[in-house]
Amino acid sequence: MTTQPSAPLTYRDAGVDIDAGDALVDRIKPLAARTMRPGVLAGIGGFGALFQVPGKYREPVLVSGTDGVGTKLRLAFEWNRHDTVGVDLVAMSVNDILVQGAEPLFFLDYFACGKLSVDTAAAVVGGIARGCELAGCALIGGETAEMPGMYPDGEYDLAGFAVGAVEKSAILDGKSIQPGDVVLGLASSGAHSNGYSLVRKILDRAGARPDQDFHGQPLADVVMAPTRIYVKQVLAALAAHTGGIKGLAHITGGGLLDNVPRILQPGLSARLHRDAWQMPQLFQWLQQQGGVADTEMHRVFNCGIGMVIVVDAAQADAVAATLAAQGETVSRIGEIVAQKDGEAQTVVV
C-alpha cells in the first residue's frame, strides 16, 4: 500500500535555500564589478565566463593554478574572522602562476558549505574581490555549493582557480640559474596560508587567546594576517630588468627547504644565510612555544620570506631597488652554489 506524504516537501525543507543563494549573488555582483579589467566579455551570472587574451601578447601561453586556504579556515571559524581568508585564497594561486612570469588575468572561486550564511559568504567573497584587485585580475565567476550534511553549520571550504598569461619567450623556468647568482627574499606578512595545523597545535599548547596582546596587536590579527600578493611589484621588476630575474619561488607548504629546489636544476644548491633577514616575532614565538627545531621551522613555514627571487649578480642591486620602490621589503638572503655530494638543494646556514 502506498502512503501519502503528510505535506509537500521543498528544497528548503531538505536544507538548501535557493533564495539565500540568490541573495548572495546580488551581494557578490558589485564586489566582482570592482575587479573588472579589459578582456572580460562576460562574467558573474552566466553559465560560463568569457575572457579575451590581451592583444599585447604575440605568443601568449596560458598559465593556471589552483589552491585552497588549508586549516587556517579552522581559526576563521573559531575566531569568526572571515574577511581576510578570501585574500589568502587569491594569493595562493596568483603568486603560484606569477612564478612562471605570468600576469594573472582572471580568477574563479568555489565556496562549499552545509548551510549557507549570506553574511559569512559575502565577507569571504569581499576578501576574494580585494585579493583580485591587489593582483590586477578579474573575479569572473565562481560556484557556491550548499550541501546539507556535508559540513557542520558555520563551516565551509574554499578553492580558488587563477588563469594568467605570459609571453612564450619570457616564461621563467629557472633553467638559466647558475652558481654565483644572488638570492633575494621578499618579506611575508606572517604564516600566510601554510603550516596552520602546526600553528593551531602550538596555540592549543600555549593556551593562547585570540584577543591576547602580541607586541601591541591582538594575537588573532597577527595569526590571521592575509597572505601577501606580490604580483604587481614583481611584474614591474620583470619588465624593468629583462633577463636579470632568472627564477621565482613562492614559499608555501614545505617552506624554504622544499620550495626553492623546485626552480633549481640538478647540481645546484641555494645557500641561504639565516642572519640575512629578521625572522618575524610570530615565528620566534611559535618556535619557542612549540619547541620546534630550526630545520622543521624552515621546512614548514616561510619564516618571514614569502617569495624568493634568483637574479643575475650584476643586476641584484638594481632589481632590489626596483622592488623596494614598489613597496617591497627586500633582503639579500643567499647565493646559488654548486651542489656538494650529499647536500640538499637548499641549505640554511
From Swiss-Prot:
Substrates-to-products reaction catalysed: 2-formamido-N(1)-(5-O-phospho-beta-D-ribosyl)acetamidine + ATP = 5-amino-1-(5-phospho-beta-D-ribosyl)imidazole + ADP + phosphate + H(+)
EC number: 6.3.3.1
Top-level EC class as recorded in UniProt: ligase
GO biological process: 'de novo' IMP biosynthetic process; adenine biosynthetic process
InterPro entries registered for this protein in UniProt: PurM-like_C_dom, PurM-like_C_sf, PurM-like_N, PurM-like_N_sf, PurM_cligase
Keyword terms: ATP-binding, Cytoplasm, Ligase, Nucleotide-binding, Purine biosynthesis
GO cellular component: cytosol
GO molecular-function terms, A-Z: ATP binding; phosphoribosylamine-glycine ligase activity; phosphoribosylformylglycinamidine cyclo-ligase activity
Tagged with keyword ATP-binding: yes
Pathway where it operates: Purine metabolism; IMP biosynthesis via de novo pathway; 5-amino-1-(5-phospho-D-ribosyl)imidazole from N(2)-formyl-N(1)-(5-phospho-D-ribosyl)glycinamide: step 2/2
Compartments, as annotated in UniProt: Cytoplasm
Gene3D superfamilies given in the database record: PurM-like C-terminal domain, PurM-like, N-terminal domain
Superkingdom assignment: Bacteria
Predominant cellular place of this UniProt entry's protein: cytoplasm
Family statement: Belongs to the AIR synthase family.
HAMAP family listed in its UniProt record: AIRS
Protein name: Phosphoribosylformylglycinamidine cyclo-ligase
